[in-house]
A protein has these predicted regions:
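Acidic/histidine-rich, metal-coordinating catalytic segments
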Residues: 90-112, 135-137, 190-192
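C-terminal domain-tail junction helix/linker
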Residues: 10, 29, 122, 127-129, ...
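Active-site beta-loop-alpha junctions of metal-dependent nucleic acid enzymes
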Residues: 48, 66-93
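Short, solvent-exposed loop/turn segments at secondary-structure boundaries
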Residues: 44, 67-68, 108-113
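An active-site-proximal beta-strand-loop segment
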Residues: 33-64, 74
């Protein structure tokens, strides 16, 4: 009957074709941001919840980490202010931040607040920073920060315990320092700090 034209053919679904990866060419061009929930097994107080906010510069892989006890748009906005200042002290101007579609970052999938910017989005706008959202349910588009979290699990959370937010923050800062000084294959076995220093020298 379809051949006789008695039923309309269903429109073929448009196939998603991934865009080629955009390689960053200088520090601060795009920074991936995400949140890692600290494993319960690492926290001494059963009532305490801890979260690691992570920013990673796509070009240099230089990371900034911060400890929070809430995963919400207020924490995200505070983290954005801190990461911008932290990178600026190292000579990097953040132009764009890339996140997933979590409610701590955007109201994109909120039924009632879809057209209302979150505090994170409002802060990005105030700071003149572009906020890019990845394709829904596609964490690989934030692959650098996702891979860094797997390294955190292996090198940090598998062998550390935390008794308070302050204790977690102190240990996380030490872990960040080690991470930024660790050689990386994508950087030709330079650490993020060394790679950034070599770029600055070449750019002069």
């Amino acid at each position: 009957m379809k051949r006789l034209g008695m039923f309309k053919r269903e429109k073929a679904k448009k196939r998603y074709v991934p865009k080629p990866y955009e390689q960053m060419t200088y520090p601060g061009q795009r920074v991936q941001v995400d949140v890692k929930v600290v494993p319960r097994s690492c926290i001494a107080d059963p009532e305490l919840k801890l979260y690691q906010y992570t920013a990673i510069d796509e070009f240099s892989r230089l990371r900034f980490l911060a400890a929070y006890c809430e995963q919400c748009t207020y924490s995200s906005a505070d983290f954005l202010e801190k990461l911008v200042a932290w990178y600026k002290r190292r000579g990097i101007t953040v132009e764009c931040v890339q996140t997933d579609n979590g409610f701590e970052f955007t109201n994109r999938f909120s039924a009632s607040k879809r057209n209302i910017p979150t505090l994170f989005e409002a802060t990005a706008f105030r700071l003149g920073i572009k906020h890019k959202l990845i394709r829904p349910y596609t964490p690989r588009h934030n692959g650098k920060v996702e891979r860094s979290h797997r390294e955190d699990q292996k090198r940090f959370y598998s062998c550390h315990s935390f008794f308070s937010l302050a204790d977690f923050g102190g240990q996380l800062a030490a872990h960040q320092s080690r991470s930024n000084n660790r050689p990386s294959r994508p950087l030709n076995w330079l650490s993020p700090r060394e790679f950034l220093a070599s770029f600055s020298v070449q750019d002069v």
